[in-house]
């Protein structure tokens, strides 16, 4: 008779699985709570201490850490010396292990949990058994996922080592992710920002039709502990499944909308905001965002930091949009937008924006870049007027608004704006004056009337950008400064009667 060891914290489906094993002529060995559940259900089951001949100790910390368990798991069945050692020590082989681990992740997500309580949910015996069984996959089945119960029962008659190897790989991924969560939890408590080893845990969320292009395979993984303010935490109410590009654009859009406490609407296209509006109401903000670039908004992503009302929903309904994401939708507004079959409607709690991930990562060939997200906001008190003319209070407000937007635009980045409304966005040009021209041409083509203000994510290397801006209606400029030719730009601004302020903080976005 073969033997199976079952020890699970989540008992879902375990009785039926054990009954299937008994029907396949397995003896069942079990521990603690799992033993009680199986025994109560009428499953023939042997308590673990009858196998180890040693009682549980240290409040259950030591139950399965015993040679009678690990010897039975690790012995190579085709190695005579291994089998002789088992016989000498009266150890019987164990042919299947079914374990899911103490709920460490669920425990640390509870706000009232102390570190001592969390530590008690670090499983030791479970991962040890999983690793022993997985190492010996040629002979042992190792089951960590309830979704595999039925398939494992079906595979028992096949004796397929390929399937056991599949289960073993899954078990090692499972224990690696579990250990990574523990390491991350303790590192956070120890305030370690950049550890010597970095292990990040992500769970499969959904398959994607394709990646950026149709010939690229893709999937979406969410952090094992996703922040409350993230696309992974958003709830989809309506529409088709998200695409790879949808997810990236929506992520970019919510970051801009979260910059502002006032009602804000962001139109995002290809990872760049094409229109941003602030207003006294969300509809007012929508009108400004739409007017900023009514062409590029087609097929875009809309993020709003207030509930979508009926008036705004009616306006959105008139356009082809990929996604609308907001804290909520008024019932009548939702009914209006749900008439469009393909639009994706999502909700996200913008009040949790302060809890967004502190760090961001970018993969490169052979490595991973990790940095703090650019969360700093330039304040009025930090601005240094470097020209003879100082900006007016209205201009200063418009400059700070534009500066909050420009840090979300691909470098070289320029934003032309008035108070609470972008008018033109120049993104991703290889020279700064090129972005200036694009932003201003867009503002003027949309029929916007000067005066405007201009924000730059980095310094002007020459005075040509300042000259062009001044000649096309710009009255005030905000930029970090820091060029060896800053004085040339200052002189040009003075010559043209433009005010300019320095922030001493760059906002590159590559």
UniProtKB/Swiss-Prot annotation:
SUPFAM superfamilies, per the entry: Cytidine deaminase-like, Methylglyoxal synthase-like
PANTHER family: BIFUNCTIONAL PURINE BIOSYNTHESIS PROTEIN ATIC (PTHR11692:SF0), BIFUNCTIONAL PURINE BIOSYNTHESIS PROTEIN PURH (PTHR11692)
Keyword presence, Calcium: no
GO molecular function, one term: phosphoribosylaminoimidazolecarboxamide formyltransferase activity
Protein name: Bifunctional purine biosynthesis protein PurH
Keyword Metal-binding listed: no
Enzyme Commission no: 2.1.2.3, 3.5.4.10
Keywords annotated in UniProt: Hydrolase, Multifunctional enzyme, Purine biosynthesis, Transferase
Catalytic activity entry: (6R)-10-formyltetrahydrofolate + 5-amino-1-(5-phospho-beta-D-ribosyl)imidazole-4-carboxamide = 5-formamido-1-(5-phospho-D-ribosyl)imidazole-4-carboxamide + (6S)-5,6,7,8-tetrahydrofolate; IMP + H2O = 5-formamido-1-(5-phospho-D-ribosyl)imidazole-4-carboxamide
Pfam short name (any one): MGS
Family to which this protein belongs: Belongs to the PurH family.
GO biological process: 'de novo' IMP biosynthetic process
Pathway(s): Purine metabolism; IMP biosynthesis via de novo pathway; 5-formamido-1-(5-phospho-D-ribosyl)imidazole-4-carboxamide from 5-amino-1-(5-phospho-D-ribosyl)imidazole-4-carboxamide (10-formyl THF route): step 1/1; Purine metabolism; IMP biosynthesis via de novo pathway; IMP from 5-formamido-1-(5-phospho-D-ribosyl)imidazole-4-carboxamide: step 1/1
Domain notes: The IMP cyclohydrolase activity resides in the N-terminal region.
GO cellular component, one term: cytosol
InterPro entries: AICAR_Tfase_dup_dom_sf, Cytidine_deaminase-like, MGS-like_dom, MGS-like_dom_sf, PurH-like
Domain MGS-like: 1-144
Organism: Latilactobacillus sakei subsp. sakei (strain 23K) (Lactobacillus sakei subsp. sakei)
């Amino acid at each position: 008779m073969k033997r199976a060891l079952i020890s699970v914290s989540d008992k879902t489906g375990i009785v039926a699985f054990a009954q299937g094993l008994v029907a396949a002529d397995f003896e069942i060995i079990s521990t603690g709570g799992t033993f009680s559940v199986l025994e109560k259900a009428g499953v023939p089951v042997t308590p673990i201490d009858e196998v180890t001949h040693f009682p549980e100790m240290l409040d259950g910390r030591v139950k399965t850490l015993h040679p009678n368990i690990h010897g039975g798991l690790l012995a190579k069945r085709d190695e005579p010396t291994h089998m002789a050692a088992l016989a000498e020590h009266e150890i019987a082989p164990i042919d299947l292990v079914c374990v899911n681990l103490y709920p460490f992740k669920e425990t640390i997500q509870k706000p009232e949990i102390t570190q001592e309580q969390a530590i008690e949910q670090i499983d030791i015996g479970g991962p040890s058994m999983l690793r022993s069984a997985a190492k010996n996959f040629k002979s042992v089945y190792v089951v960590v996922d309830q979704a595999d119960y039925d398939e494992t029962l079906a595979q028992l008659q096949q004796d397929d080592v390929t399937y056991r190897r599949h289960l073993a790989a899954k078990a090692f991924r499972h224990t690696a992710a579990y250990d990574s969560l523990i390491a991350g939890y303790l590192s956070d408590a120890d305030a370690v920002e950049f550890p010597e080893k970095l292990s990040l845990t992500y769970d499969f969320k959904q398959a994607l039709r394709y990646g950026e292009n149709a010939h690229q395979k893709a999937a979406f993984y969410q952090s094992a502990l996703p922040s409350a303010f993230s696309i992974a935490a958003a709830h989809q109410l309506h529409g088709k499944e998200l695409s790879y590009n949808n997810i990236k654009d929506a992520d970019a859009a919510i970051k801009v909308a979260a910059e502002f406490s006032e009602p804000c609407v962001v139109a995002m296209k290809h990872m760049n905001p094409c229109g941003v509006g602030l207003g006294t109401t969300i509809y007012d903000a929508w009108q400004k965002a739409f007017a900023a670039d009514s062409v590029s908004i087609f097929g875009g992503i809309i993020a709003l930091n207030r509930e979508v009302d009926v008036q705004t929903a009616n306006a959105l309904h008139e356009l082809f949009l990929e996604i609308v994401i907001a804290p909520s939708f008024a019932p009548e507004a939702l009914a209006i937008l749900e008439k469009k079959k393909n639009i994706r409607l999502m909700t996200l709690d913008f009040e949790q924006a302060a809890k967004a991930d502190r760090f961001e990562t970018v993969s490169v060939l052979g490595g991973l870049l990790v940095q703090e997200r650019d969360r700093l906001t330039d304040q009025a008190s930090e601005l240094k007027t470097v020209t003879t003319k100082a900006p007016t209070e209205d201009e200063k407000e418009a400059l700070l608004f534009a500066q909050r937007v420009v840090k979300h635009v691909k470098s070289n980045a320029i934003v032309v704006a008035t108070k609470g409304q972008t008018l033109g966005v120049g993104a991703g040009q290889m020279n700064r004056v090129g972005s200036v021209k694009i932003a201003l041409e867009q503002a003027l083509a949309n029929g916007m009337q000067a005066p405007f203000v201009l924000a730059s994510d980095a310094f002007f290397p020459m005075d040509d950008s300042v000259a062009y801006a001044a000649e096309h209606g710009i009255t005030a400029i905000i930029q970090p400064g820091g060029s060896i030719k800053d004085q040339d730009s200052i002189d040009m601004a003075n010559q043209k009667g433009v005010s300019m302020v320095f922030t001493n903080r760059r906002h590159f976005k590559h």
